[in-house]
Amino acid sequence: MDIRQVTETIAMIEEQNFDIRTITMGISLLDCIDPDINRAAEKIYQKITTKAANLVAVGDEIAAELGIPIVNKRVSVTPISLIGAATDATDYVVLAKALDKAAKEIGVDFIGGFSALVQKGYQKGDEILINSIPRALTETDKVCSSVNIGSTKSGINMTAVADMGRIIKETANLSDMGAAKLVVFANAVEDNPFMAGAFHGVGEADVIINVGVSGPGVVKRALEKVRGQSFDVVAETVKKTAFKITRIGQLVGQMASERLGVEFGIVDLSLAPTPAVGDSVARVLEEMGLETVGTHGTTAALALLNDQVKKGGVMACNQVGGLSGAFIPVSEDEGMIAAVQNGSLNLEKLEAMTAICSVGLDMIAIPEDTPAETIAAMIADEAAIGVINMKTTAVRIIPKGREGDMIEFGGLLGTAPVMKVNGASSVDFISRGGQIPAPIHSFKN
């Protein structure tokens, strides 16, 4: 490595807000299944605190050694609906509390996996888990929840969509932060290191390390050097920058897996913003020539960014996965917040951008009087984009306050302006229930 590359890396960290967003340890809880829910909770606590005992210490050690901030250390676990189904319990809050207790004991920031996979219907534990979500997220601090309601192979479970509209409302009514820790997916992935949607898939190894990186500030600085040049140059610049970012992510992941004695899983090729100035995906899109994100051309700019990040990342690391798409969470990106406030970015444009990125309606505040059926219809729209286009899409939406208010979440979750929602009713549409069938092009066998 020549001196120029060394100084570039130092600048990425000191001036351009580059960091490793998360080291996430995935832990299988299948061997914790027990017909007694309290025994299951104890087994869960013991396994997590044993397997992840050194996760935070190792993360801090690597950060100090390399001089690269590692912002979050997290744990993801087997979807709890699978564990709870073996019991006769009528709610799974006790399992959520076991997760929370374990997370606090080992010192991680979040623990994900209070989850259910219901894309084609409910099994015994699924409905119980879904109805437990409001209390589980209210009575815990670090637990995150996700529900997969659709897939390209299965279609969209509209009964579950309707239920999740209600659950999001109930969660927001019980807790200021609860809905910010709840994601509804289509085509959810099993190796996602990012919260709130992380869970440990049943096809994964017993314990695994996945890494998520963050580098929109680095990409923006690189694009500042090629202002006015063609999109060919822009694409090449993004690709080369993504290569460097991913290389560092791979190094951190491999070091962590070696020191913890577990398998290295994947690097998630996602650009994850923060509320800090200089760490915004929106500002990257504007650097390509948009006056403000949300104007015409935004979706095309996002497409270029997303694709070139993947091309550069795949060259840098063999093992890539997770969501691997630019994140556009409104409350967590100062450029997105500004665009909503100046009127150029609305829910409809964010829905269009979902066709490109992984989580379209992410960390969005909407009026608290929005009907549950309208929230469900938003979920259905996002799921349809994912199911038809064979990609992951998701909704993380917070019904709080009135249009124009600012909702403060703090920390990495930032501040969300309450956005306008279409007032026309979707009640009759959502009340049908049942299943939207899988698209014809899903029939591959």
Swiss-Prot record:
Record-linked CDD domains: RNR_PFL_like_DUF711 (cd08025)
Source organism, top-level taxon: Bacteria
Quaternary structure (record): Homodimer.
Family: Belongs to the UPF0210 family.
Protein name: UPF0210 protein SP70585_0294
